[in-house]
């Protein structure tokens, strides 16, 4: 099988993952069949306007709470939102996580994602063999010195001639950093001016740029378009001046041809709110709320569960 998840393949992770080691004791042998199902369901989400007109959009959100237990939500864009809780299992403690991607080879499946644990960056993998409902969870350490980062997200552009995988990190010094990842994370630029950012997620990945959606402590909502070229020169555009200050976690999935389904989480009230966000055009961007739900799992870390080959996010 040709694997386009270049970053994690280069890190030594495969569907077998024989060289990896557990992150902590108790990290192996969870039992989350619904995580596997959530990753596979991403391939059936509407990616055209015609499909979105007849089928509801959705987003699968993984989560890890303070005890290192994994859970999450499978969310359908109805009003109010239709929410199914994902099975919980003992994982390991993480401070932040990128997207987790599901890749399949025959009857075997594996989820891959980047996580922060303490001051370290890990590439984690949960692999399922055959019909097993219990994955083996392992991780490979990619580097130390990450204690100053409080948010990470990533892009995974897998179509066309200019494929790329970038990891973005928000640092306490107020800068946004970009990394390429192989056997380690290597800097590919940074930009100051992001000290007010509270939460971020990726809404677009293309051959020439990535687009992040961020909230600020003052409640504003912005897009940050980052050309894939170096040096890193992000373009920041205001979407809304207020109304988004309570959200500490954002998770985005493609909805139709150019839109985004956004799950925003308030950690203080344990509420999740679902928004349909049209293609980002600054203050004229269409945003519709589907309402809120009680995020009863109580996690502080949320991340997208999706397929390794998409849906490709195209919302900005």
What is each of the regions a protein language model found here?
Residues 1-29:
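Secretory targeting and sorting signals
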Residues 42-58, 85-112, 140-163, 193-209, ...:
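Repeated scaffold domains used in trafficking and secretory/extracellular systems
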Residues 58-83, 109-134, 164-166, 173-180, ...:
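Structural motif
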Residues 18-65:
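C-terminal region of N-terminal signal peptides and the immediate post-cleavage residues
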Residues 135-139, 184-188, 235-236, 283-287:
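Predominantly a core beta-strand signature of beta-propeller blades
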Residues 28-30, 256-316:
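Hydrophilic extracytoplasmic domains
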Residues 177-248:
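Short helix-loop boundary/capping segments
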